A protein has these predicted regions:
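Rossmann-like NAD(P)H-binding beta-loop-alpha module
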Residues: 18-19, 30, 138-161
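A Rossmann-like FAD-binding core segment of flavoenzymes
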Residues: 65-91, 96-99, 160-256, 295-299
Length: 300
């Protein structure tokens, strides 16, 4: 078995794969495991480990897999081939790997604003997941950037926790569901900042404010905030798997078994089309993918 990615889904697959006595390898392009949780200062919704740091949780997952003997390779995937004999070959910058089964746990990358201060303050006030990190800003001032369902939902979620929420959107109308928009407009502690873009994220080691520019007037203003939640889209890491069926956004299609349209290939975690993307659901995917793979191998 080849496991691509060492976020929660890939690491859970490694644990379950080792326990199933599979001959496997985990391929990760980064030197550090954890995936998206590395961007989270604290993870407060993983049962049994309240308040654990995202980096620490990722390392605990990896240590567990390594303790069971799972081998890890640092390599960036460039191509995946489906062979006539049913095996799958993964080609990386450092070498190639062939196995009977493949678990794709490559994750999804949040779209960035691409403004000064964003990368420097990610994890120090800047987040891409309100349900993950919102509770850390209880009774404080936050802002959400975006205009779709996720941004509207994030603003409503944060409004229940925070003193005030700015919702910053580059247009004067939202592209999200009308029912969500109506709720946002009816919520007293949500202030709309429309026709506006974030030009800079400011802070010295910790987020302090954002510089916002009105597109119509050209006027700039600085909003003092404690937390910034960026919800301008997410991009699944599925480009290396053109043989897989995906939805219009690139998420791999598959049910809770994590099976895809290709026998012996499984999609787990954020790369899979699913309703909830959290650490706990990614871990479940990793377990289900291995269970499905074991069943596939047994039937061969």
């Amino acid at each position: 078995m080849i496991i691509i990615g060492s976020g929660p889904a890939g690491l859970a697959a490694a644990v379950y794969g080792q326990r199933a006595k599979l001959d496997l390898v985990v391929i990760e392009k980064q030197m550090i495991s954890g995936g998206q949780i590395l961007n989270t200062t604290e993870v407060d919704n993983y049962p049994g480990l309240p308040g654990i740091g995202g980096f620490e949780l990722g390392q605990k997952f990896r240590e567990h897999a390594e303790k069971l003997g799972a081998p890890f390779v640092t390599d960036e995937i460039t191509e995946v081939r489906l062979n006539e004999d049913g095996t799958k070959t993964v080609v990386g910058s450092e070498g190639s790997y062939t196995a009977k089964t493949l678990v794709i746990a490559s994750g999804a990358e949040h779209s960035l604003l691409g403004v000064p201060g964003e990368k420097e303050l990610t994890g120090s006030g800047v987040s891409y997941c309100a349900t993950c990190d919102g509770n850390f800003y209880r009774n404080r001032v936050t802002a959400v950037v975006g205009g779709g369902d996720v941004a509207l939902g994030d603003a409503l979620y944060l409004a229940r926790l925070c003193q005030k929420v700015y919702l910053i959107h580059r247009r004067d109308s939202f592209r999200g569901a009308k029912i969500l928009e109506d709720k946002v407009r009816e919520t007293e502690n949500i202030e709309l900042v429309l026709d506006s873009t974030v030009e800079e994220i400011r802070g010295d080691g910790q987020l302090k404010s954002v510089l916002v520019k009105n597109k119509k007037s050209g006027a700039e203003s600085e909003l003092a905030i404690d937390g910034l939640f960026i919800a301008v889209g997410i991009v699944p890491e599925s480009k290396n798997f053109p043989f897989l069926a995906t939805d219009e956004r690139g998420y791999v299609l598959g049910d809770e078994s994590c099976e895809t349209n290709v026998p012996g290939v499984y999609a787990a975690g954020d790369v899979r089309k699913k309703q909830l993307r959290q650490v706990i659901t990614a871990v479940a995917d990793g377990a289900n993918a291995v269970e499905s793979a074991v069943r596939y191998l047994t039937e061969q």
